């Protein structure tokens, strides 16, 4: 089985949305009614996406609701699998 790197939703947010769309983290924070620190921590992979965060990002970026939660769930499952595989 091939090892695929686990990607945090913050990486997707930065590489597929913010950078190509020319949106700053602070502009996203304003549009999503979130603190700039919260957005920055998601982008840096320091904070996970919650139901509330998913709804705010979906509204601000025009993504489907649950898009960000699904990315988070996939990240969590792959991260957990990696931990278990090390035993």
Language-model regions, residue ranges each:
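A short, Lys/Arg-rich alpha-helix, primarily the initiator
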Residues: 1-23, 67-70
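The alpha-helix within a helix-turn-helix
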Residues: 18, 29, 58
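Short alpha-helical DNA-recognition segment
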Residues: 22-41
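The DNA-recognition helices of helix-turn-helix-type DNA-binding domains
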Residues: 35, 46, 72-75
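DNA major-groove recognition helix of helix-turn-helix
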Residues: 43, 53, 72
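Short, basic-rich loop-to-helix N-cap that marks the start of a DNA-contacting helix
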Residues: 46-59
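Short, charged recognition helix plus adjacent turn
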Residues: 67-87
């Amino acid at each position: 089985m091939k090892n695929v790197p686990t990607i945090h939703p913050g990486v997707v947010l930065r590489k597929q949305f913010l950078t190509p769309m020319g949106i700053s983290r602070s502009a996203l924070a304003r549009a999503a009614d979130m603190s700039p620190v919260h957005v920055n921590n998601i982008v840096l992979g320091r904070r996970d996406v919650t139901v509330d965060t998913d709804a705010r990002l979906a509204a601000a970026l025009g993504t489907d609701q649950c898009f960000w939660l699904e990315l988070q769930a996939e990240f969590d499952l792959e991260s957990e699998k990696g931990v278990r595989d090390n035993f």
